[in-house]
From Swiss-Prot:
Residues 94-1210 are annotated as: Disordered. This is Collagen alpha-1(I) chain. Residues 168-1181 are annotated as: Triple-helical region. Pfam families: COLFI, Collagen, VWC. It comes from Mus musculus. It is found in: Secreted, Extracellular space, Extracellular matrix. SUPFAM superfamilies: FnI-like domain (SSF57603). GO terms for cellular component: collagen trimer; collagen type I trimer; collagen-containing extracellular matrix; cytoplasm; extracellular matrix; extracellular region; extracellular space; secretory granule.
Length: 1453
């Protein structure tokens, strides 16, 4: 029955379930029972005595177990409850008789203990005393219920239910009050804790032995006797028959009431008494340690308005103005451009036939032949390697309890228990032989002190003192030595094909290699069939252009050309007369928001918000500590009978030993049967406290009392833990043959088989893909004059001519496109109210409202089901020594024992002379644990620790990008003959070549190794001998290796103290222009273009990575060196680009950082003292939360009066509720911070993208991020663009002053000079917020790059007489800046598009003597290239050449 579960316990367990449940996705399962839908894990009572639970979609029901044997005349039953109970005022007739009410005792602490008088007769039991103060904390609780109970709890957590309301923190306890007046005698309380021992009285004389009293109750079991001498081993008994394992029984009925427990140890201090009179104020105490972090204070008043932001960038260009008046007629234009080319002339006569062309390239392979018939199944392959473990399946529903398993193997022997206490004296033995000479008599006069004994064993570790003040941080460790190289990284993707290089000159002829061994004669091959004629080859390439034809006749005049471009703007005309006054301006934009008004009254509490989305599952925690010992298991089956021992011989009794030291108090035995009630004696007056006397002699053992009446059956017990595994059963019969296994993975390739017979030729293959264009052949002979070409495309527009005479008026133009949207008109008068619209759609779920008032305590939950039996837990730690067992039966007469221990000391002898100093005493046994010491003062600062161990090798970095392909070099001259090379390794197997003509019969080959039998192939057609095929392409990259094992999760560091809020930073510069749109998808590969004219020599490329050795190509015929073509004419300059648009407005300034947390509220007044609480519950289950502060749940009262009472004063419950609710509030705050970080210094987000997803309505601004997670002390401040989710990291020095930075020693020799590396006052660009550690920023940027797919950055180059990108004088980009990325790749203005940047504004194209600027933008998906760390201009070095830089933020998304 779960009636003992208190709602607060469920609340707290629910919170822990929330932590796990919130990070898992539990599918929504429910049960339908008699038309009622019940969520998974909920319990309900369809009938009063029937309880059901929804378990994974199935309703499981059971009867409620009741205690039917109620010992009262009129049991009562509450409405809706199944089980009856006795009213509280009813007293069972079986309870003890109540004696005469004693005099009312004075309240106050228990007095000192009186002396022990002679044992008197048992008095009648007195009136029940006042309720005692709270009992001591209970024993450690059972181990946590583990997975099954946690899952049952998590099912009870309803995702749709309201959140847990959380009150404020508990105030400090008030001072202890004075004792209250004595109350009326209450009901019988629990056994109070023993009072503090009184001052020891003087020892009284030993009284005379009193007469034997009436038989008393059975005493506690005696302390364990000394271990008996081991008997001789008996003969082995017969092996018992193995019993069948029984099935696990259902949980038993409620057991009988247990016996009263032992007196507990001294209890904790009771609850605070009523408030005493205020004392005189004490001196100020030493400052205490910093308290725990207070709850957030109330929201502060709005701060004063911030200072005005920096001026924004120029606004966008305004709309075009109205057209001006018609200008005067221009001068006549220049003559028109040459007319278009004339129409093609008639086709000429067919020319004479040219010489035969060069042999065409091999045709594409034919289509694949039809599939042949399936071959016979081959032999089974070797069994494949074991597959990887599959993903864990969905957990099945708990099964019914299985049959009790056989006992597991015997666990390891526990450590030897402590020495048992002395046993009761045995029965007197037979008189022994005369003993050896007795020990020396009583000690003489004390000798001089002996030497100091050995140091005693170290006592048990005391309770840890309070934490000392934190020591100062140690010195920063030096950098670790370089780690070992990491493992090879995964092969990078195949790089793009480089441009085909020009063929190099033929190398010198190598010296002849060594002669090969003659092969064994091969079998003569059969003559191949004549191959079918090949399909016609592809059309040959277009030949080189013929010589220029004769000049044609002048064509007719062309149509008039397109209107030329507008001429250069003339000088400004004279100032016009003043215009008419303009119209009234439009309504202005709304003014800035006014000052924030005073805070309004607190609104009413909103409705509870919907729970947030589930967070991601946390990483698996470390192995927890071993749990405390589990519940007592069910009794195991009776073991086989032991071997009977041989009867021992009667030993000679030894001398009576000296009394041993008093052993530790044994656990209290079960109470004996109740004795016969003695006659009531008169109540004597209360005596004065006497001094404690010596212990009296032990009385005779009383006769056993009559058995008491049977108690009521106890509550139904929780199911015990699963018993230990039994011994393994006998080997089962051989199982049936299993089903045929799945096909094994293909075996390794077998050894090469013998050459098969030549098959018939296959059918013609499908035409293959068009091969890549081969190198240009030598120029052919001059062909006949070709036919006139088609009309060429229109050439580029010529330069602008002078304006021609004005033309005649044109036709009326077509209707223009709609104009731009006009300015907003003045607001019209309000229209009449429209009819009421239909109700709108249901809005989205609102944000969570403020916390509602605390709900009333819910009714006790319904009874839960017993959980399924847990798995067998790991063996618990060795248990404490058990209580002493009952005395065994008297053994048979043993043999003569060893010499007895020393008898009691004889009468003291005469004092002897002082003895010599004794030897050093034996090491003393460890003393008992001392009380916890007061906290020590903080120790001095420790010396800095040694340098850390060299770090483990880092992971291998990503494979570098392939270098740019270098330009084709000019063919070198033929070199001298080289020395003979060694025979090269065979190249990779190429694809089969085209069918060739039949070959001649080869020599007989040597027999190959025997291959594994292949499937019978269908007889193939005989194929022609093919030509040598071209080398095959390199194979696809191998599959990536299996991911390495996940490293262990690091421990969470302690959260640092909140630092003081820093001063507001200066207003940052205006933001850079917004990012360009995302890069479009990559286009399809274009067809190979025709070969262009030979270009001019390019810049020298970077050295590429060494490629893998290519397969040897077939040797080509050495062609004659082609004639070098003449340099082409210089092309006309391109038309000037249209001017770029003005930049967008800058981003709004960042939001200020959140204000500091408010101070903790003042402590509330101390509450009124509550009555003493019930005894503490058993300790918490291991590994869970500490529930020891919860009030105990009420019990269903039975005739024993119940074990617990609910406190009458609700304040006790409220105080403890406050602790629970505070804990819950802290928990929920932490969960919320994990699931939805706020981007502050204490709670940084991972990236701005995370912040945007969690808080889509937040504005762009500066926030804190911690991409590598872990401790937040290395978080960095970045700018978050909330519209794009970009994380922008600013440089620590965003601008380089505009001045002359470099004077070249040789001004004529222009080369790129790196600003940070080579210029005298230059510096590399570093990134991060002000005051951040560059090493921390570098690590954070590494993680940020890994979590981003695109990066971009802008750099503005301010120039004076320095070209930044396009050189207006030459029209090329040879003087463009170089940028160096973070991975040291250089980014250029021209070349491979993957390593080039673009410009948004280019105002540095010529030397004008004035300052201009060029804005460079680089955007890439290779995030490791950004941010840019250095810039190298080329056009600098003269005294009048100056430049400066503005470095924009690197933005990642």
């Amino acid at each position: 029955m779960f009636s003992f579960v208190d709602l607060r316990l469920l609340l707290l367990l629910g919170a822990t379930a929330l932590l796990t449940h919130g990070q898992e996705d539990i599918p929504e399962v429910s049960c339908i029972h008699n038309g009622l839908r019940v969520p998974n894990g909920e319990t309900w009572k369809p009938e009063v005595c029937l309880i059901c639970i929804c378990h994974n979609g199935t309703a499981v029901c059971d009867d409620v177990q009741c205690n039917e044997e109620l010992d009262c005349p009129n049991p009562q039953r509450r409405e809706g409850e199944c089980c009856a109970f006795c009213p509280e005022e009813y007293v069972s007739p079986n309870s003890e008789d109540v004696g005469v009410e004693g005099p009312k005792g004075d309240p106050g602490p228990q007095g000192p203990r009186g002396p022990v008088g002679p044992p008197g007769r048992d008095g009648i039991p007195g009136q029940p005393g006042l309720p005692g103060p709270p009992g001591p904390p209970g024993p450690p609780g059972p181990p946590g219920l583990g997975g099954n109970f946690a899952s049952q709890m998590s099912y009870g957590y309803d995702e749709k239910s309201a959140g847990v309301s959380v009150p404020g923190p508990m105030g400090p306890s008030g001072p202890r009050g004075l004792p209250g007046p004595p109350g009326a005698p209450g009901p019988q309380g629990f056994q109070g804790p023993p009072g503090e021992p009184g001052e020891p009285g003087g020892s009284g004389p030993m009284g005379p032995r009193g007469p034997p009293g009436p038989p008393g109750k059975n005493g506690d079991d005696g302390e364990a006797g000394k271990p008996g001498r081991p008997g001789e081993r008996g003969p082995p008994g017969p092996q018992g028959a193995r019993g069948l394992p029984g099935t696990a029984g259902l949980p038993g009925m409620k057991g009988h009431r247990g016996f009263s427990g032992l007196d507990g140890a001294k209890g904790d201090a009771g609850p605070a008494g009523p408030k005493g009179e205020p004392g005189s104020p004490g001196e100020n105490g030493a400052p205490g340690q910093m308290g725990p972090r207070g709850l957030p204070g109330e929201r502060g008043r709005p701060g004063p308005p911030g200072t005005a932001g920096a001026r924004g960038n120029d606004g966008a260009v305004g709309a075009a103005g109205p057209p001006g008046p018609t200008g005067p007629t221009g001068p006549p234009g220049f003559p028109g451009a040459v007319g278009a080319k004339g129409e093609a002339g008639p086709q000429g006569a067919r020319g004479s036939e040219g010489p035969q062309g060069v042999r065409g390239e091999p045709g594409p392979p034919g289509p694949a032949g039809a599939a042949g018939p399936a071959g016979n199944p081959g032999a089974d392959g070797q069994p494949g390697a074991k597959g990887a473990n599959g993903a864990p399946g969905i957990a099945g529903a708990p099964g019914f309890p299985g049959a009790r398993g056989p006992s597991g193997p015997q666990g390891p022997s526990g450590p030897p228990g402590p020495k048992g206490n002395s046993g009761e004296p045995g029965a007197p033995g037979n008189k022994g032989d005369t003993g050896a000479k007795g020990e020396p008599g009583a000690t003489g006069v004390q000798g001089p002190p002996g030497p100091a004994g050995e140091e005693g064993k170290r006592g048990a570790r005391g309770e840890p003192g309070p934490s000392g003040l934190p020591g100062p941080p140690g010195e920063r460790g030096g950098p670790g030595s370089r780690g070992f190289p990491g493992a090879d990284g995964v092969a990078g993707p195949k790089g793009p094909s480089g441009e085909r290089g020009a063929p190099g000159p033929a190398g010198p002829k190598g010296s002849p290699g060594e002669a090969g061994r003659p092969g064994e004669a091969g079998l003569p091959g059969a003559k191949g069939l004549t191959g079918s004629p090949g399909s016609p080859g592809p059309d040959g390439k277009t030949g080189p252009p013929g010589p220029a034809g004769q000049d044609g006749r002048p064509g007719p005049a062309g149509p008039p050309g397109a209107r030329g471009q507008a001429g250069v703007m003339g000088f400004p005309g004279p100032k016009g007369t003043a215009g008419e006054p303009g119209k009234a301006g439009e309504r202005g934009l709304p003014g800035p928001p006014g000052a924030v008004g005073p805070a309004g009254k607190d609104g009413e509490a909103g409705a509870q918000g919907a729970p947030g989305p589930a967070g991601p599952a946390g990483e698996r925690g470390e192995q927890g500590p071993a749990g405390s010992p589990g519940f007592q298991g069910l009794p195991g089956p009776a073991g086989p009978p032991g071997e009977a021992g041989k009867p021992g011989e009667q030993g000679v009794p030894g001398d009576l030993g000296a009394p041993g030291p008093s052993g530790a108090r044994g656990e209290r035995g079960f109470p004996g049967e109740r004795g016969v009630q003695g006659p009531p004696g008169p109540a004597g007056p209360r005596g004065n406290n006497g001094a404690p006397g010596n212990d009296g002699a032990k009385g005779d053992t009383g006769a056993p009392g009559a058995p008491g009446s049977q108690g009521a059956p106890g509550l139904q017990g929780m199911p015990g833990e699963r018993g230990a595994a039994g011994l393994p059963g006998p080997k089962g019969d051989r199982g049936d043959a299993g089903p045929k296994g799945a096909d094994g993975s293909p075996g390794k390739d077998g050894a090469r088989g013998l050459t098969g017979p030549i098959g018939p030729p296959g059918p013609a293959g499908a035409p293959g893909d068009k091969g890549e264009a081969g190198p240009s052949g030598p120029p052919g002979p001059t062909g006949a004059r070709g036919a006139p070409g088609d009309r060429g495309e229109a050439g580029p527009p010529g330069p602008a001519g002078f304006a021609g005479p004005p033309g005649a008026d044109g036709q009326p133009g077509a209707k223009g496109e709609p104009g731009d949207t006009g300015v907003k008109g003045d607001a019209g008068p309000p229209g009449p109210a429209g009819p009421a619209g239909p109700p709108g759609p249901i809005g989205n779920v609102g944000a969570p409202g403020p916390k509602g008032p605390r709900g009333a305590a819910g009714p006790p939950g319904a009874t839960g089901f017993p959980g399924a039996a847990g798995r067998v837990g790991p063996p618990g730690p060795s248990g404490n020594a058990g209580p002493p067992g009952p005395p065994g039966p008297v053994g048979k007469e043993g043999g003569k024992g060893p010499r007895g221990e020393t008898g009691p000391a004889g009468r003291p002898g005469e004092v002897g002379p002082p003895g010599p100093p004794g030897p050093a005493g034996e090491k003393g046994s460890p003393g008992a644990d001392g009380p916890a010491g007061s906290p020590g003062t903080p120790g001095p600062q420790g010396i800095a620790g040694q340098r850390g161990v060299v770090g483990l090798p880092g992971q291998r970095g990503e494979r570098g990008f392939p270098g740019l392909p270098g330009p084709s070099g000019e063919p070198g001259k033929q070199g001298p003959s080289g020395s003979s090379g060694e025979r090269g390794p065979p190249g990779p197997m190429g694809p089969p070549g085209l069918a060739g003509p039949p070959g001649e019969s080869g020599r007989e080959g040597s027999p190959g190794a025997e291959g594994s039998p292949g499937r019978d192939g269908a007889p193939g057609a005989k194929g022609d001998r093919g030509e040598t095929g071209p080398a095959g392409p390199p194979g696809a990259p191998g599959a990536p290796g299996a991911p390495g094992p996940v490293g262990p999760a690091g421990k969470n560091g302690d959260r640092g103290e909140t630092g003081p809020a820093g001063p507001a930073g200066p207003i940052g510069p205006a933001g850079a222009r917004g990012p360009a749109g995302p890069q479009g998808p990559r286009g399809d590969k274009g067809e190979t273009g025709e070969q262009g004219d030979r270009g001019i020599k390019g810049h020298r490329g970077f050295s590429g990575l060494q490629g893998p050795p290519g397969s040897p190509g077939s040797p080509g015929e050495q062609g004659p060196s082609g004639a070098s073509g003449p340099a082409g004419p210089r092309g006309p300059p391109g038309s000037a680009g249209s001017p770029g648009k003005d930049g967008l407005n800058g981003l709004p300034g960042p939001i200020g950082p959140p204000g500091p947390r408010g101070r903790t509220g003042d402590s509330g007044p101390a509450g009124p003292p509550g009555p003493p609480g019930p005894p503490g519950p058993p300790g918490p289950p291991s590994g869970g939360y500490d529930f020891s502060f919860l009030p105990q749940p009420p019990q269903e009262k039975s005739q024993d009066g119940g074990r617990y009472y609910r406190a009458d004063d609700a304040n006790v419950v409220r105080d403890r509720d406050l602790e629970v609710d505070t804990t819950l509030k802290s928990l929920s705050q932490q969960i919320e911070n994990i699931r939805s970080p706020e981007g502050s210094r204490k709670n940084p987000a991972r990236t701005c993208r995370d912040l945007k997803m969690c808080h889509s309505d937040w504005k762009s601004g500066e926030y804190w991020i911690d991409p590598n997670q872990g401790c937040n002390l290395d978080a960095i401040k970045v700018y978050c663009n909330m519209e794009t989710g970009q994380t922008c990291v600013f440089p620590t020095q965003p601008s380089v002053p505009q001045k002359n930075w470099y004077i070249s020693p040789n001004p004529k020799e222009k080369k790129h000079v790196w600003f940070g590396e080579s210029m005298t006052d230059g510096f590399p660009f570093e990134y991060g917020s002000e005051g951040s550690d560059p090493a921390d920023v570098a690590i954070q940027l590494t993680f940020l790059r890994l979590m981003s797919t695109e990066a971009s950055q802008n750099i503005t180059y301010h120039c004076k007489n320095s070209v930044a990108y396009m050189d207006q004088q030459t029209g090329n980009l040879k003087k463009a800046l170089l940028l160096q990325g973070s991975n040291e790749i250089e980014l250029r203005g021209e070349g491979n598009s993957r390593f080039t940047y673009s410009t948004l504004v280019d105002g540095c194209t010529s030397h004008t003597g004035t300052w201009g600027k060029t804005v460079i933008e680089y955007k890439t998906t290779k995030t490791s290239r950004l941010p840019i760390i250095d810039v190298a201009p080329l056009d600098i070095g003269a005294p009048d050449q100056e430049f400066g830089l503005d470095i924009g933020p690197a933005c990642f998304v």
